[in-house]
Amino acid sequence: MVAKDYPFYLTVKRANCSLELPPASGPAKDAEEPSNKRVKPLSRVTSLANLIPPVKATPLKRFSQTLQRSISFRSESRPDILAPRPWSRNAAPSSTKRRDSKLWSETFDVCVNQMLTSKEIKRQEAIFELSQGEEDLIEDLKLAKKAYHDPMLKLSIMTEQELNQIFGTLDSLIPLHEELLSQLRDVRKPDGSTEHVGPILVGWLPCLSSYDSYCSNQVAAKALLDHKKQDHRVQDFLQRCLESPFSRKLDLWNFLDIPRSRLVKYPLLLREILRHTPNDNPDQQHLEEAINIIQGIVAEINTKTGESECRYYKERLLYLEEGQKDSLIDSSRVLCCHGELKNNRGVKLHVFLFQEVLVITRAVTHNEQLCYQLYRQPIPVKDLLLEDLQDGEVRLGGSLRGAFSNNERIKNFFRVSFKNGSQSQTHSLQANDTFNKQQWLNCIRQAKETVLCAAGQAGVLDSEGSFLNPTTGSRELQGETKLEQMDQSDSESDCSMDTSEVSLDCERMEQTDSSCGNSRHGESNV
């Protein structure tokens, strides 16, 4: 799972901490204060200051989006007030220090007289990007341990067991990438060029299989970290880190997600090197082999991570009664998507789409853990009817919020319904935006088509491009593309779980469920 330095206070020049004032007349000695004069550390962080050794702060290279979940986090930047912050970085004068560069041609002062073709320069740039990315990754992984793990352990902010759960096998990943970086540097010529990288990659990439345990642990790690943030000591520590320069305005989870982001980027990096490698270069065959290796590893880890995520959420489902348990849930190995939606009363629901069953729940706190209490019966995907509702077609009701919203067009709703004999359900669900709604529609359609195909009831597309269910004769739009894993559905859509509201309504929901007979057919109003 990318992702996305040390002291909590820095020594600074007096000039950086005060407003510019006209020079006062006085002895020259007063005007020329030593440039290394230090200011007193902030009192609120004195307990943390000596725990973290200073390191060089370098910008994190931004990674492209990946095909698995990539949880994005936004941090609000505070405006500077009058004087610049004590830790504000001043641009170094070009005459004394060269600006750090991420480009091979700038780093090694490539001269046009070296007779390199444009394609070869691009190849060297791609190889250097691979090497530089390893260096950045190693630095950030070490930072995560020294700036977060070790201080929290020493200050007893978290227990060792909790930190082991959150950080997983992160320590074991550092030597792997140090080995690759060392090999890449060894084959680099004095002029900065690299002739062959294929054999190195073919020999090194198989060790990335060890990412299996780290990535599979991320769902549980993220959940525990979010839970621990309710502890004011943890929240205070993480907030101070976020406001410190070493963090680059990234929170702890951004750093913990960097290994996964790096893993899924390797195929792109290797393809870029291959694209600029001449056909007669011996490296081409090795690069093609390396791409096949990393694609297989990523696919395998992706599968195992998905299974781990599915198990995690199945273990946190709470059933109000035995009749809600469904063998389709127990047999599911893949969680197609999940996230927060609202019903037509504005009540927050957390919906899970497993391989063959849709489960609508309410988030509750149980034994100090976030769990998901089933609301109504699970809906088999094969019997599920999906309807895309036009904006304004659904009216909010049953609350003050709904009373004042009647004049507005209610947007981003879709409806799922189910009828099997005397059992029936209808739920109008609202996504937070159009994109999120379309993701849900695509994912449900894809899951339904997969189930029907597996049952030998493959639907057909009519002339209008709709999916025709041969069993019911109902017509649905065909999903355009297979949905990416929606592990970021809550974070990217800025939806947070309102556990306080859920806890208050828990008893009311139980009474509602007990009073609802199986033959009752109506909207999912809580």
Swiss-Prot record:
Superkingdom assignment: Eukaryota
GO biological process: positive regulation of Rho protein signal transduction; regulation of small GTPase mediated signal transduction; Rho protein signal transduction
Gene Ontology MF, one: guanyl-nucleotide exchange factor activity
InterPro entries, sorted: DBL_dom_sf, DH_dom, Endocytic_GEF_Adapter, GDS_CDC24_CS, PH-like_dom_sf, PH_domain, PH_RhoGEF3_XPLN, SOS1_NGEF_PH
Domain PH: 291-449
Keywords: Cytoplasm, Guanine-nucleotide releasing factor, Phosphoprotein
Biased composition annotated in UniProt, kind: Polar residues: 466-475
Chain segments carrying region Disordered: 20-40, 464-526
Domain DH: 122-304
Places the protein is found: Cytoplasm
Phosphoserine modified-residue sites: 47, 70
Main location group: cytoplasm
Cellular component terms per the entry's GO annotation: cytosol
PROSITE patterns: DH_1, DH_2, PH_DOMAIN
Tissues expressed in: Widely expressed. Highest levels are found in adult brain and skeletal muscle. Lower levels are found in heart and kidney.
Pfam families xref list: RhoGEF, SOS1_NGEF_PH
Task performed by this protein: Acts as a guanine nucleotide exchange factor (GEF) for RhoA and RhoB GTPases.
Complexes and interactors: Interacts with RHOA and RHOB.
Record-given protein name: Rho guanine nucleotide exchange factor 3
